[in-house]
Amino acid sequence: MNLYALSVNHRANPLGINSDEQPYFGWKLKSEKPNTMQAAYRLRIYADDTVCFDSGRVETACNAFVCGPDLLRPQTFYRWAVTVWDNHGENTTAESSFETSLSSKEWKADWMRTPRAYVQRKKGFGTQPPATLFRRAFTLSAAPRRARLYATCLGVYRLTVNGKRPDMREFAPEHTSYKGLLCFQTYDLTALLHIGENVLGMEVGDGWYCCPQTQPPIDGLQPDHTVLFQLEIENADGTHTRICSDEGVLTHESAVRASDIFDGELYDARLALPGWDMPGFTAADWLPAVKDTKQSDSVLYPQFDDPVICVKELPAQCVYTSPKGETIVDFGQVVAGRARVTVDLPTGAAVTLEHFEAVDAKGNYFNNIDSAMGITEQKDVFISDGTPQTFEARFTFHGFRYLRVSGVENPIAAQFVAVVLSTEKTNAGTFECSNADLNRLYQNTRWSQCANMLSIPTDCPQREKAGWTGDISLYAKTALLNEDVTPFLTQWLQSLCVDQRENGSIPFTVPDVSIYHYAGIQMGEQTGCGGPVCSAGWGDAAVTVPMAMYEVTGNTCILEKQYDSMKGWCDYVISRARIHAPNSTLPDEVEEHLWDTGFQFGEWLVPSLAGAPQEQLFTTMATTSAYTTPIFGWLVVHKMAQAAAVLGREEDAVRYQEEADKMKHAIRAALITADGVLRYERQGAYVLMLVFGLVPDAWVDKFGTKLAEIIHANGDRLDTGFLPTPYLLDALCIGGQRELAYTLLYQTESPSWLAQVKRGATTIWESWEMYQPDGTPKKESFNHYTYGTVDDWMFRTIGGIDQEDTGYRRLMIHPQPDKSLTWAKRSFETENGTVYVSWKREGGQFILTADIPCNTTARIILPDGTQHTVGSGHYTLNC
């Protein structure tokens, strides 16, 4: 037996965790012996080789989210060791490490701001002020033994130390709810510092904080480039040196003449200052930074998740001339990131790179990013200094597959690279089967997840780049089945807590940014609901995201951390349910527990309701919200009861379950007729009632048959919007219509998943149909992950891996393929290790192979109904 994948806060050897919060630990077991289970563990933590925490021997199989000491010392390197005993009498020990960050009480640095006069930002390319160079020189008289830098800014920054980047992170300090949460980063600079002069350099662009669409909704805010950093050095001679952002910080305009997180970046190489962040540079004409006394250290928090980095580089597939004479570069894949170009141009010559997702019907440039915010240009411009250079923007990113290029004569594909950006995450799963279209659908989901998990979970990486709560509320489970997003979602949920209102309601987007904050107020005024408003299915993220994390990984720590926030939203939902709908004829005891008032999005983007004039939007939302609102209201209260029970909050568990039961009764009374049919003959209504168990047992098959009739009447095509689609195929299976579920999965006529694949999609689209009849793309996003939730169904039903307990500790391996599929493979990295299942039809037999990790049991069900209960090990079974 051996141990691997040791982690603290779900990260390997993390640098700079919060010393004020209880850390959690994890490890995994490997053993050649079958049926291996952990019997006990002992966790020890060392500081300066002295044991500061010892759990003693703990008799449990738990090996993930194991809580450590309540408090740790700040700025301290810790070594930790875990000893594990298994059920075969063996034991082994493994070690790892972590380090705590600067505590909130230890900040001595000053906020230092650019000295230029404030420039109000306006939307549009090139309208922003230049990025700012912040330079802090200092001298060391002794060699550093240990050096840690803690840094952040208002805007986004790129750090250099003596001209070198300590890591390759992008967009630090990233996107959070700035009014109450600003992350800082921890860097190990030990190897980058030396005796003599040293220079810290921070180049700061506008980022999210200074952008008019995404700046925090704070009255009177005048956002501009501001830095805060503190360098703590332990010298080899035993002395200590501290270097802070202070009056010694000098500033200068950058060669980045304008940068906007949406519209793009303008860079003039003629204005670059080579060596500005190196010792020996003359900064005589630089201006001192100005101390900003308005900023507070109270919002500072050490970054919990991993950084945004380049996760992949894609070479251009081809360069062609469009019918309009444009130079078009095709990378073959829709991504989030930016383009890199290598050129050799005369001084003053400019290269323009316009990023876009889809060409028009004839292959010309087409800007599909047009919204209430106006047209987003997604443009980067590079002005040459006359030397050969490789250009890549620094403080922006785009959603694109294509470039329209101006200013490069006779370009070739080798000059262009697509730099794919995303938050760094560990892959957690794979899927492949005999149907190539389903494989492409799976890959499309993975690409959309990559693009929309850049600092925060977004709806799209080009038009809005916003943390729409509804998207991640629905997609969180699928995300966890694809990648380790535990640190990522933990960080985002912290912003959700900051933005949650006093009454418990949740904004449309987290972080709550200006454009959607004020849109929420406006929507409230337009609908007479007051504002800012929220919606069922969207605000639910406060409950559904932490619950998805718990259900997939067994993470009880996140339930503890988010518990008050979860209760806040549920109590808000219950308070809304108490408000009776105008002109309601329902009995008071029903209305009292039915959420059917207020602003609501409803299903959202139902195909048969798509394309309606703007003035009909609220009408179509009301049509479907009549059932989505009470159903999703019940769902979060039901899940809240489950969370309370898991944490041993018995009084809360009883209270919320009693309310959920009353809501369930009210939903049945309001939505189901005496004849056993729904008052709303829509696919989405039947889907939600079936999948959440809201249908009386005696009527389940009847509801399944009715749902099938509605689908058949629609040409065997789906007609579900945003909220019901993730549950569509499961609802059909519950209602005894598995064959129809496969029919919908394989459907190639729009609206359907494979219609997109057949149309050449490389990501998941915002709407089911993204092209006009003449082939012209719609002005919508080609990169939204939410409809990719179908992957979850494929993983379970085709791949065969499901769970019978939280955290996949007890597996159910039960492939249920239709006759057209001949083989499939699925792997998933659980908290215990890798589960791998493959099956194939060969020679009249169904042959299944399974690898079960240690600390796990599985019930394997073959297509003929044969069942096998097994422990860890390798198995081959057939029928």
What does each model-found stretch correspond to?
Residues 1-463, 470-471, 487-490, 507-511, ...:
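Extracellular/oxidizing-compartment recognition motifs
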Residues 347-362, 420, 432, 439, ...:
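Acidic, mature catalytic/reactive cores of soluble proteins
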Residues 546, 634-637, 641-644:
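Non-transmembrane amphipathic alpha-helical segments
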Residues 200, 267-268, 464-467, 474, ...:
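C-terminal capping/lid segments that line or modulate ligand- or cofactor-binding pockets
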Residues 219, 223-232, 241-276, 302-305, ...:
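Non-catalytic C-terminal accessory modules of carbohydrate-active enzymes
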Residues 148-151, 338-357, 392, 406, ...:
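Alpha-helical support elements that line or immediately flank enzyme active sites
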Residues 122-129, 148, 166, 174-178, ...:
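Alpha-helix capping and helix-loop boundary segments enriched in small/acidic/polar residues
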Residues 156, 226-228, 246-253, 412-443, ...:
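Active-site acid/base region of carbohydrate-active enzymes
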